[in-house]
Amino acid sequence: MTTVARLRALVVLLIVVFLVGFVLVQALEPDEPGSGGTVPVAGDTTTLPGDTAATTAPGDTSATTTPGGNLPPLQEVTLELVFDGLRQPLALTAPAGDDRLFVVQRVGVIRILDENREMVDPAFLDLTDRVLAGGIEQGLLGLAFHPDYANNGRFFVYYTDKEGRRQLSEFQVTTTDPNRADPGSERVIIEREQPPEASDIRHYGGNLVFGPDGNLWVSIGDGADSRNQGQDPNTIFGTISRIDVDGDDPYGIPADNPFVDGGGAPEVWAYGLRNPWRFALDPTEGNIYIADVGHAHQEEINVVSMLEGGYNFGWSDMEGTRCFHQPDCDPADYTQPVVTYLHNDQWTEGEPHPPGLSITGGYVYRGSEIPEIQGTYFYADWVEEWIWGFKFVDGQLTEHEDWTDRLGGTVGQVNSFGIDGHGELYLLTHGGQVYKFSAVR
């Protein structure tokens, strides 16, 4: 080979080496900070985190695409028993991202189930020295962790005290043990006697939920004083109320509460409720789901925008869709429920929904383990022990159906539903069991 030919070959070899090296560097070089990888453009079919490119309904055998890859086909959704032996559990929750479960027992004790679903001893908080749990609707009723719990250790409980008063209080976790709260750290936020004409043991409400606005939402029953409470927005009884626990002592009033400038108690966000035992906020769609326990005829679920307020749900002028204390009422004057079902003695064959006597409101499923049921709201009847669900999309009720058999049959009286720190759904039974909604694939 001539000298010129050798030089030409060397030049070609150097060019090839340079090009290969450039391609490898580009392939291995990370994206710019904050870029998050490839950003889809119009017409791109890339799945973003949080999106579900394809889902299957129960019974469908096609695969489900999630950010982590393809899930095997969903065979069924079941209720998986994760713990047994609690004393009348009424609420289950956890700080965001936490692997533990915090379970409220009516007697006045909060227990922790660790990541292996073993009970942690001693209890997280024991308030049996100050909680009255005599009547079936009394006791330690609600729990919510402050949105910044990881940094400030603050949480809130709702209970009936030894005098039968409603008590909303703040506590703090100890600085030395994340599994122990300080019972001496109590700061009373709201304390109310039962209304003058109320029952001593009934209609306390008691659900606590922090909204995406950082405010604490509270359900408060009418005390079984239906003629004096439900239609009076100047009292917090029979309402969903909303307060700012980071505001003035003992609490502040959100500037956009509907009665902040008058016309009702400033804490009140909505009224006309009997005993809203459980409600749920769904920030994804911007709705609040309120399950209100009925009196003589109907149980009901109200779904409205959580961005507004001032709703009057009708009690006690109305019960569900029927006039009650006001026989000539005009339903157009009140916000109407999206779901009602009749009590046993009102029900007749052919009704589209089974009868019941006491609704237990649940949550909209927004977890990641069962994307096929995303957006489904679940609820139960405490007496009849069935479980139903529906979706509420663009103001319309869809996929309203019986889930009892699909979940494996009845599990007993459902006291409450719960959400863990990762958005997965649970239910609690009067018999002391904790069940998780789980996928079989």
Kindly give the residue locations of the regions a language model identified.
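Beta-propeller domain segments
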Residues: 104-107, 138-140, 148, 223-401, ...
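Acidic, Gly/Ser/Thr-rich repeat motifs that build Ca2+-stabilized beta-propeller blades
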Residues: 17, 22, 58-59, 66-226, ...
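Hydrophobic residues at beta-strand termini and immediately following loops
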Residues: 82, 124, 189, 269, ...
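Conserved blade-ending motifs and adjacent loop-strand segments that build the rim/top face
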Residues: 273, 397-421
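N-terminal Sec-pathway targeting helices
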Residues: 1-14
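C-terminal region of N-terminal signal peptides and the immediate post-cleavage residues
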Residues: 20-45, 55, 61, 75
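Blade/loop signatures of beta-propeller domains
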Residues: 54-78, 178-183, 249-261, 324-335
